[in-house]
């Protein structure tokens, strides 16, 4: 019986993970769950799965959750805050940690799981974008097992040699696929007027609002490029992005002999989640098997960087190295939140990120404190840009 902790249990990844657990009660039990503010969803999960511990973001949310669980007769221990979140990530009572908190907020707890030598199922790409060197060092030094859950990186992991899932061993290129989001064919001159609801209407995947906007700008793919660099040791020039509107081929690996290995499947995050949970075995994920006779043609195209400037900015940050990826991520988080709140235009997201990247960066990528200093400085810089863009 594998005991699992889910960080970000009420998000789309967390709920999909619980669905896989639900299908295999003989293999998995839930040790701990966390959510930031969705108390009702977390309470329902605690009633069903009876975790030993649950963590929320605030004292008020903790009181509300405790009351609900007490009324339901559920003895789950409730706590709140960043320290409590790190505590459940490194808890001796858990074997595997699903790191599914979105954004920089998930960095410390994901890193805590790695430093505790856990089996880390990494859906929080920002952990590697912000502090890739620190994170990978922690995995090696503490004997953690790192399994990528993003569908693209999970696909690459499956296509690389199992004896050494890193760049090398005859690998010539890593090919990340992208759906292109909802604006793949839209005239770039009209993107100025995109609304948050339009940006969040992804044609293939069901995701939260922040990652949906990142998909629409292709910043999500840019962050995944940086993540792939750290996960697989591939240099920027050996990572290629291809738009694949059908979202059937989740990524590919090209080899020196001319072979290209691809992982295919219906677009459902339960597939990579189940793969990570059961690795090296495979289990039923609940996903409908792919029928290639129904899927039809598979099409690929090169991204248009005029339409998707955020993708180019991510490659720039990767090549710059140091804290540039952390700066990129922080500025993007601020800009996307502002867009979702109606404070700036869709096209302003890339403008904010580009402007902040051009500024001298504070902090060092050698320590977590340095990375967090760069993150804070970049957020201040991005906030400073918002005023000049508001109302445009």
Curated annotation (Swiss-Prot):
| Organism domain of life | Bacteria
EC number per UniProt: 1.1.1.267
Q: What class of enzyme is it?
A: oxidoreductase
Which Pfam families does the UniProt entry name for this protein?
Answer: DXP_redisom_C, DXP_reductoisom, DXPR_C
Pathway(s) this gene product operates in, as recorded in its UniProt entry:
Isoprenoid biosynthesis; isopentenyl diphosphate biosynthesis via DXP pathway; isopentenyl diphosphate from 1-deoxy-D-xylulose 5-phosphate: step 1/6
UniProt binding sites for 1-deoxy-D-xylulose 5-phosphate:
125, 151-152, 179, 202, 215, 220-221, 224
Q: Which residues bind Mn(2+)?
A: 150, 152, 224
Cofactors named for this entry: Mg(2+); Mn(2+)
Q: Which UniProt keywords apply?
A: Isoprene biosynthesis, Manganese, Metal-binding, NADP, Oxidoreductase
Sites binding NADPH sit at 10-13, 37-38, 124, 126, 208
- Which molecular-function annotations from GO does this UniProt entry contain? 1-deoxy-D-xylulose-5-phosphate reductoisomerase activity; manganese ion binding; NADPH binding
Tell me which Gene Ontology terms the entry assigns under biological process: isopentenyl diphosphate biosynthetic process, methylerythritol 4-phosphate pathway involved in terpenoid biosynthetic process
List the catalysed reactions: 2-C-methyl-D-erythritol 4-phosphate + NADP(+) = 1-deoxy-D-xylulose 5-phosphate + NADPH + H(+)
| UniProt similarity note | Belongs to the DXR family.
Identify the PANTHER family for this entry.
1-DEOXY-D-XYLULOSE 5-PHOSPHATE REDUCTOISOMERASE (PTHR30525), 1-DEOXY-D-XYLULOSE 5-PHOSPHATE REDUCTOISOMERASE, CHLOROPLASTIC (PTHR30525:SF0)
Q: What's this chain's function?
A: Catalyzes the NADPH-dependent rearrangement and reduction of 1-deoxy-D-xylulose-5-phosphate (DXP) to 2-C-methyl-D-erythritol 4-phosphate (MEP).
Name this polypeptide is given: 1-deoxy-D-xylulose 5-phosphate reductoisomerase
- Source organism: Cupriavidus metallidurans (strain ATCC 43123 / DSM 2839 / NBRC 102507 / CH34) (Ralstonia metallidurans)
Provide the taxonomic classification.
Answer: Bacteria, Pseudomonadati, Pseudomonadota, Betaproteobacteria, Burkholderiales
């Amino acid at each position: 019986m594998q005991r699992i902790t889910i960080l970000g249990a009420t998000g789309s990844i967390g709920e999909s993970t619980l669905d896989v657990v639900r299908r295999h009660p003989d293999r998995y039990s839930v040790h701990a769950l966390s959510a930031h503010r969705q108390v009702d969803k977390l309470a329902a999960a605690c009633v069903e799965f009876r975790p030993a511990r649950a963590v929320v973001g605030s004292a008020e949310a903790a009181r509300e959750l405790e009351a609900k669980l007490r009324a339901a007769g559920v003895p789950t221990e409730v706590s709140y805050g960043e320290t409590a979140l790190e505590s459940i990530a490194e808890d001796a009572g858990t074997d595997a940690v699903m790191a599914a908190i979105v954004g920089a907020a998930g960095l410390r707890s994901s890193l805590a799981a790695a430093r505790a030598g856990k089996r880390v199922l990494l859906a929080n790409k920002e952990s590697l974008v912000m502090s890739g060197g620190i994170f990978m060092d922690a995995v090696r030094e503490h004997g953690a097992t790192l399994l990528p859950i993003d569908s693209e990186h999970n696909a690459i992991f499956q296509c690389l040699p199992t004896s050494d899932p890193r760049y090398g061993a005859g690998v010539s290129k890593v090919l990340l696929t992208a759906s292109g989001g909802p604006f793949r064919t839209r005239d770039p001159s009209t993107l100025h007027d995109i609304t948050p609801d339009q940006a969040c209407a992804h044609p293939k995947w069901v995701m939260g609002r922040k990652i949906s906007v990142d998909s629409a700008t292709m910043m999500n793919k840019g962050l995944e490029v940086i993540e792939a660099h750290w996960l697989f040791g591939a240099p920027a020039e050996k990572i290629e992005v291809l738009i694949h509107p059908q979202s059937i081929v989740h990524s590919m690996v090209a080899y020196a002999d001319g072979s290209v290995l691809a992982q295919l499947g219906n677009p459902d995050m339960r597939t990579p989640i189940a793969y990570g949970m059961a690795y090296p075995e495979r289990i039923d994920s609940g996903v409908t098997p792919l029928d290639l006779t129904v899927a039809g043609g598979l099409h690929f195209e090169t991204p248009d960087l005029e339409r998707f400037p955020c993708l180019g900015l991510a490659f720039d940050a990767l090549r710059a190295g140091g804290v540039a990826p952390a700066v990129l991520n922080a500025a993007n988080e601020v800009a996307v939140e502002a867009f979702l709140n109606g404070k700036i235009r869709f096209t302003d997201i890339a403008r904010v990120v580009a402007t902040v990247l051009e500024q001298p960066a504070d902090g060092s990528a050698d320590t977590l404190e340095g990375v967090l200093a760069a993150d804070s400085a970049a957020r201040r810089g991005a906030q400073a840009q918002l005023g000049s863009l508001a109302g445009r």
